[in-house]
Amino acid sequence: MGLLGKLFRKKPRDAAAASASTSTVDAADEAGEAAGQRAPDIAPELASALAAFQAGRHESAIAAAAPHAARLADAARLCALAYSAMQRYPEAFPYWLALFDKEPSAHNAVQLATTSVMCGEVARGEAWMQKAAEINHDTHEQSDVAARVNFISALMQSGRLREALPHLAWVRDVYGHVRITDSTFLYMRGIPFFSSFLERSLEILKATQPADAIVPWYGELTGKLDEEGEAQLAAWIGQLPGQPAA
């Protein structure tokens, strides 16, 4: 794997932690690590494309990298990232697909899933998420939860809040499965902090559910968490509207 593979595909643990609060559809954030690199390990014909990308000249980066995209994975990656940084997702998708053909990783499958959503192709995105899960089952290269959070973030950014509900419930049930809500434990597994999950999930629930359905939705976790988590959950539910009369 070349320089761009190292720069823009975070190590599994790093990616999992970062993905708990950010979405990989923001390619500019992924590229941030590149700015300080010296003596880049990249094909010489891509040096100008990388320099342009680092300087934020995305059109120039694409012009320099595109002629090599069929041959070099890093060229396809550069084009995909540059188009994504400009929010030109339909143009980014073919390059993510070309990259996946060369590097069929779970990470790249998630990129195809989130990019599909940003193109308005939710069903295609769901299929790529399934593919990512299948690959990750064998490779264990990333956190399944972090990947799912990225997909939810893409759905939220594209205004597909109702489609995010099943995935949100999946993440909710992870807390009930692991039972532990200690921040370090969650961080090391790419699971969002429990407080962050409560806050971010409410935005989706308010937009898609009747008020009297929100408390029962969170109530699915009652009795399934550690002591700290149960206390946090009770406090959260207690301040929500739609409480039953005492």
Predicted regions and their residues:
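Eukaryotic alpha-helical solenoid repeat scaffolds
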Residues: 2-28, 157-246
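Structural signature of alpha-solenoid helical repeat junctions
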Residues: 40, 71, 78, 104, ...
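"A position-specific structural signal for the A-helix of alpha-solenoid helical repeats
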Residues: 43, 47, 78, 111, ...
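Alpha-helical segment of the N-proximal tetratricopeptide repeat
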Residues: 32-85
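Alpha-helical junction/boundary sensor with strong preference for TPR arrays
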Residues: 65, 72, 103, 135-139, ...
